[in-house]
From Swiss-Prot:
InterPro entries recorded: Cys-rich_flank_reg_C (IPR000483), Leu-rich_rpt (IPR001611), Leu-rich_rpt_typical-subtyp (IPR003591), LRR_dom_sf (IPR032675)
Gene Ontology CC terms, in alphabetical order: glutamatergic synapse; membrane; plasma membrane
Gene3D superfamilies for this protein: Ribonuclease Inhibitor (3.80.10.10)
SMART domains reported for this sequence: LRR_SD22, LRR_TYP, LRRCT
PANTHER family: SLIT AND NTRK-LIKE PROTEIN 4, SLIT AND NTRK-LIKE PROTEIN 4-RELATED
Residues annotated as domain LRRNT: 333-375
Segments on the Cytoplasmic side according to the record's topology features: 640-837
First-listed, main subcellular location of the protein, grouped into a coarse class: membrane
Tissue spec: In the adult, significant expression is detected only in the brain. Broadly expressed in embryonic brain with highest expression in subventricular zone, subplate, cortical plate, pyramidal cell layer of hippocampus, thalamus and hypothalamus.
Residue ranges constituting the LRRCT domain according to the UniProt record: 213-264, 531-582
Organism: Mus musculus
Protein name in the entry: SLIT and NTRK-like protein 4
Length: 837
């Protein structure tokens, strides 16, 4: 005990000292590898939770990796010792909060990775101390809000990755002081991007990712559409797909016109004009002192423009560009793309970031993938949507191993043969929407280990076989909306860490929680609207599961379609007892007032045990356990009872009404059955015995009329208990002519060694009893005839008839002699002495 106390106190003292003193060299705890004079410090999975306790490495510049540790909260000055770090990886730490000043001291930091954590907000003081940051990655978090001024100090920030979060809007002027060239906001909740305050500050961007947001294609999206139409062709901008209103659902924003977006005419036309640098109002000041002004003009009287304005040499016709924008565009246009073949009916362009080829074959009336000749080299993106492709063969993608995106949407594909995509190991996005696929099976997606986004909406899918998505361990987004699905197989999502799931507008009447929905452990968004939900007992489990989800995960509330009384009523507004009246039908005592129903729920849903139905397994196991415990307890009680009963001393029986039981005596006499002989020895010989006091026993209850009764004894002898009065009568009839012989009497009493041993054992055993005796009775053993003859031959004749009453004191001497073997010479001497008498 003292040892444990000593260890605990020592640990507390050491932890207290560690808070203020740096005692461990980081390279002694982590792995340090130098590559081309650059040190890489890998502290992944080494249980580090206080980096400020580590000494910095000796190198001038180094990369720090603290992934997969216990950094749940970053306190101020956490990395103050690592002033020469150029990159810091903090991914996969379940990081929930970053306090202001946590990055103080990282003045040389260029890259910061905060991906795959649980951050919910980026505050204005989150990035204090890292003003030289150029690359910030914060994807796959739970970020909902970004405070104004969060990036104001990051003047050199060029790459910002915020995809797959819960961001619904961007605050005004959030990017005003940053120099962004790459912005990724995919997979969020953004419905609109205003020009003023957001788009006007990202004029330097060369890559903008907009996919997988619920874009509201209304008048609010006209600024984004106008801005996209005026961007140079060599700038990569992801597709913005309309989600609302319903008549534009699934449409690309660039394919819509202004009349469709804003039919009422309010703000029906927008035009982005870049004004001369002479105007300073609301301008952006460049490092050389010039200010570029961008304003937004609304020309209500102007008729709608076409959605495809002509572009000459990357500059919008009729638009004037500032020197800054012009020089930037020219720099990208002067870059010589690699010589690569492009299929005849398609249009190819080189991606500016990695020089990968983007092949655009949209709406070229292509009947088969075999028409794409010559096959492009180093293709990263392949758009074949809007054609007439019906079948996809195994050999169609043999030369597209480097694809990152494959768009086969809006075709007439009915059959996809197995292992068609097996060689597309780098594919991250696959579009199969808008086809006529009816059935999904595992072989279709074989080989797509890195696939993250799968679009299967607007098909005729009726059945999905078990294990279909198991070959995609990185799948995060799955769109199955607008199909004909009625059910899903068990464990269909167990092999895919889905974050976003869309099952809207199918034929689901209910969805099981057990084995299906409970497998969605990383869910951030789910859409179940537009299904004919049957609001009965089968939907109670789904309702309980939805109630446990965090706010914002469910896109829209579910509405009942059947039964009729619940039509168009939101599921969450109905109580469980109303959905399932069986929950109220439980046996209970009679009460005059209604009592609230108690519903026992589990993660699998409510437990309903109808009368006569099977007993739940949990109750059965509990019952068996109770029975076993009771059985062991009863057996233990019986064992204790038996042991205690055996240890108790023999209970003395109380007297049976006879007051003489306490004075009963036990005497030994020999009784010969052959009384017809005249020999005096044949009658009886008295040997005085000590009166043994006995406890009260059952013999006390004998009637006075009973003079004796027999007990079983060793073979050849009988034990007879006689009354003391009978004994006295027998003594009166003793032959007076008989001579007294002590030896004779002893021999007659103990005719053999066995008898002697018996008496000796008997005398020794009497110590175990306290006052054992029977008052008024004697014990007699009949003598054997053969022993009698042997004694006569030894002694030589009959003795005189003398009765000697031994005194009580002589008994002890006789007793001592009986316990030892008799001497033959002594016997002869005593015999001679007696004969003389």
């Amino acid at each position: 005990m003292f040892l444990w106390l000593f260890l605990i106190v020592s640990a507390l003292i050491s932890s207290t000292n560690a808070d203020s003193d740096i005692s461990v060299e980081i390279c002694n705890v982590c792995s340090c590898v130098s590559v081309e004079n650059v040190l890489y410090v890998n502290c992944e999975k080494v249980s580090v939770y206080r980096p400020n306790q580590l000494k910095p490495p000796w190198s001038n510049f180094y990369h720090l990796n603290f992934q997969n540790n216990f950094l749940n909260i970053l306190y101020p000055n956490t990395f103050v010792n690592f002033s020469h770090a150029v990159s810091l990886h903090l991914g996969n730490n379940k990081l929930q909060n970053i306090e202001g000043g946590a990055f103080l001291g990282l003045s040389a930091l260029k890259q910061l990775h905060l991906n795959n954590n649980e951050l919910k907000i980026l505050r204005a003081d989150t990035f204090l101390g890292i003003e030289n940051l150029e690359y910030l990655q914060a994807d796959y978090n739970l970020i909902k809000y970004i405070e104004r001024g969060a990036f104001n100090k990051l003047h050199k920030l060029k790459v910002l990755i915020l995809n797959d979060n819960l961001i619904s809007f961007l605050p005004d002027n959030i990017f005003r002081f940053a120099s962004l060239t790459h912005l990724d906001i995919r997979g969020n909740r953004i419905q609109k991007l205003p020009y003023i305050g957001v788009l006007e500050h990202i004029g330097r961007v060369v890559e903008l990712q907009l996919e997988d947001n619920p874009w509201n294609c209304s008048c609010d999206l006209l600024p984004l559409k106008a801005w996209l139409e005026n961007m140079p062709y060599n700038i990569y901008i992801g597709e913005a797909i309309c989600e609302t209103p319903s008549d534009l659902y699934g449409r690309l924003l660039k394919e819509t016109n202004k009349q469709e977006l804003c039919p009422m005419g309010t703000g029906s036309d927008f035009d982005v004009r870049i004004l001369p640098p002479s105007q300073q109002e609301n301008g952006f000041t460049t490092p050389n002192g010039h200010t570029t002004q961008t304003t937004l003009h609304r020309l209500v009287t102007k008729p709608p423009k076409t959605t495809n304005p002509s572009k000459i040499s990357g500059i919008v016709a009729g638009k004037a560009l500032s020197n800054r924008n012009l020089s930037q565009i020219v720099s990208y246009q002067t870059r010589v793309p690699p010589l690569t073949p492009c299929p005849v009916p398609c249009f190819c362009k080189t991606h500016p970031s990695d020089l990968g080829l983007s092949v655009n074959c949209q709406e070229k009336n292509i009947q088969s993938m075999s028409e794409l000749t010559p096959k492009p080299l180093n293709a990263k993106k392949l758009h074949v949507n809007g054609n007439n492709i019906k079948d996809v063969d195994i050999s169609d993608f043999t030369e597209f191993e480097g694809l990152d995106l494959l768009h086969l949407g809006s075709n007439q594909i009915t059959l996809i043969k197995g292992e068609v995509f097996h060689n597309l190991t780098n594919l991250r996005r696959l579009y199969l929407n808008g086809n006529q696929i009816e059935r999904l099976y595992p072989e279709i997606f074989s080989g797509l280990h890195n696939l993250q986004y799968l679009y299967l909406e607007y098909n005729l899918i009726k059945e999905i076989l078990a294990g279909t998505f198991d070959s995609m361990p990185n799948l995060q987004l799955l769109y199955l909306n607008n199909n004909l699905l009625k059910s899903l197989p068990v464990y269909i999502f167990s092999g895919a860490p889905l974050a976003r799931l869309n099952l809207r507008n199918n034929k689901f009447m209910y969805l099981p929680v057990s084995g299906v929905l409970d497998q969605l452990q990383s869910l951030t968004q789910i859409d179940l609207e537009g299904n004919p939900w049957d609001c009965t007992c089968d939907l109670v489990a789904l309702k309980l599961w939805l109630e446990k989800l965090n706010d914002g995960i469910v896109v829209k509330e579910l509405k009942c379609e059947t039964p009729v009384q619940f039509a168009n009523i939101e599921l969450k507004s109905l109580k469980n007892e109303i959905l399932c009246p069986k929950l109220l039908n439980k046996p209970s005592a009679t009460f005059t007032s209604p009592a609230p129903a108690i519903t026992f729920t589990t993660p699998l849903g409510p437990i309903r045990s109808p009368p006569g139905g099977p007993v739940p397994l949990s109750i059965l196991i509990l019952s068996i356990l109770v029975v076993l415990i009771l059985t062991v307890f009863v057996a233990f009680c019986l064992l204790v009872f038996v042991l205690r009963r055996n240890k108790k001393p023999t209970v003395k029986h109380e007297g049976l009404g006879n007051s003489e039981c306490g004075s009963m005596q036990l005497q030994l006499r020999k009784h010969d059955h052959k009384t017809n002989k005249k020999d005096g020895l044949s009658t009886e010989a008295f040997i005085p015995q000590t009166i043994e006091q006995m406890s009260k026993s059952h013999t006390c209850g004998l009637k006075e009329s009973e003079t004796g009764f027999m007990f079983s004894d060793p073979p050849g002898q009988k034990v007879m208990m006689r009354n003391a009065a009978d004994k006295d009568k027998d003594l009166l009839h003793v032959d007076t002519r008989k001579r007294l012989s002590t030896i004779d009497e002893l021999d007659e009493l103990f005719p053999s060694r066995d008898s002697n041993v018996f008496i000796q054992n008997f005398l020794e055993s009497k110590k175990e009893y306290n006052s054992i005796g029977v008052s008024g009775f004697e014990i007699r053993y009949p003598e054997k005839q053969q022993d009698k003859k042997n004694k006569k031959s030894l002694i030589g004749g009959n003795h005189s008839k003398i009765v000697v009453e031994q005194r009580k004191s002589e008994y002890f001497e006789l007793k001592a002699k009986l316990q030892s073997s008799p001497d033959y010479l002594q016997v002869l001497e005593e015999q001679t002495a007696l004969n003389k008498i």
